[in-house]
Amino acid sequence: MTDSATTNGDDRDPEIELFVKAGIDGESIGNCPFSQRLFMILWLKGVVFNVTTVDLKRKPADLHNLAPGTHPPFLTFNGDVKTDVNKIEEFLEETLTPEKYPKLAAKHRESNTAGIDIFSKFSAYIKNTKQQNNAALERGLTKALRKLDDYLNSPLPEEIDTNTHGDEKGSQRKFLDGDELTLADCNLLPKLHVVKIVAKKYRNYDIPAEMTGLWRYLKNAYARDEFTNTCAADSEIELAYADVARRLSRS
């Protein structure tokens, strides 16, 4: 048995409902990179789906019964509840396939791991309370960001193949794996956005201007509705980290 909507000639869209974390008001989109990741994937697939925000302070009984013990994000696909984000991504890519739905997997394996350590470096930096450790942790974050910047500025094989003039230095692609958003971007961009907002708010840290590949990447992402319209408000992200971001002390 398969969940595919096109099985046996049935070309109807599947019934999909995505449940994401709600914001402070209990209704708007809250800070949750994993929720945004799935929201972006479904939007990019071009499939019809509904989104329900879940207020974790007042989780309705029907949702508790639907996915007991589970925090958003999760989704229902033709009535089946799916709760593991990585498995949901894999399932959607295997089920919502061409010709009807675009393939979103990255072509280059390196695109899937680009920026993989940024969020852990950011978390260590933002949670630190000791002034004497701040500079080293900041350097660790900057180093991870620079590694991503280097990847974004390094031409992909197909860019090298098409660059016959030899006068173009570096890559000019829009996203991790080319000029289209892929699953790799859906994973990284929500986290990168949080890093940008929170590090500035609580540590007055800006992503260095000389990281041209990284800023090109962010500029292109902010030009896409699939990203900007699935982001939580900046104030939501800042509030989510109000208790996490620690004040620095000399003790």
From Swiss-Prot:
One of its GO terms (molecular function) is oxidoreductase activity. Keywords: Cell membrane, Cell projection, Chloride, Chloride channel, Cytoplasm, Cytoskeleton, Golgi apparatus, Hearing, Ion channel, Ion transport, Membrane, Mitochondrion, Oxidoreductase, Sensory transduction, Transmembrane, Transmembrane helix, Transport, Vision, Voltage-gated channel. GO terms for cellular component: actin cytoskeleton; apical plasma membrane; cell cortex; centrosome; chloride channel complex; Golgi apparatus; mitochondrion; plasma membrane. It is a single-pass membrane protein. It is an enzyme of class 1 (oxidoreductase). SUPFAM superfamilies: GST C-terminal domain-like (SSF47616), Thioredoxin-like (SSF52833). Detected in lung and inner ear. Detected in embryonic cochlea, on microvilli-covered apical surfaces of interdental cells, columnar cells of Kolliker's organ, and on stereocilia of inner and outer hair cells (at protein level). Also detected in the eye, where it localizes to lens fiber cells in the lens epithelium (at protein level). Inhibited by F-actin. GO terms for biological process: auditory receptor cell stereocilium organization; diet induced thermogenesis; inner ear receptor cell stereocilium organization; neuromuscular process controlling balance; protein localization; response to dietary excess; sensory perception of sound; visual perception. The chain crosses the membrane at residues 34-54. Residues 101-241 form the GST C-terminal domain. CDD domains: GST_C_CLIC5 (cd10297), GST_N_CLIC (cd03061). It catalyses: Na(+)(in) = Na(+)(out); K(+)(in) = K(+)(out); chloride(in) = chloride(out). It is found in: Golgi apparatus; Cytoplasm, Cytoskeleton, Microtubule organizing center, Centrosome; Cytoplasm, Cytoskeleton; Cytoplasm, Cell cortex. A motif (G-site) lies at residues 32-35. Pfam families: CLIC-like_N, GST_C_2. The keyword Protease does not apply. Component of a multimeric complex consisting of several cytoskeletal proteins, including actin, ezrin, alpha-actinin, gelsolin, and IQGAP1. Interacts with AKAP9. Interacts with TPRN. TPRN, CLIC5 and PTPQR form concentric rings at the base of stereocilia and may form a complex. Interacts with EZR, MYO6 and RDX; the proteins may work together as a complex to stabilize linkages between the plasma membrane and subjacent actin cytoskeleton at the stereocilium base. Belongs to the chloride channel CLIC family. In the soluble state, catalyzes glutaredoxin-like thiol disulfide exchange reactions with reduced glutathione as electron donor. Can insert into membranes and form non-selective ion channels almost equally permeable to Na(+), K(+) and Cl(-). Required for normal hearing. Necessary for the formation of stereocilia in the inner ear and normal development of the organ of Corti. Required for the proper localization of PTPRQ and RDX to the stereocilium base during postnatal maturation of hair bundles. This is Chloride intracellular channel protein 5. It comes from Mus musculus. The gene is Clic5.
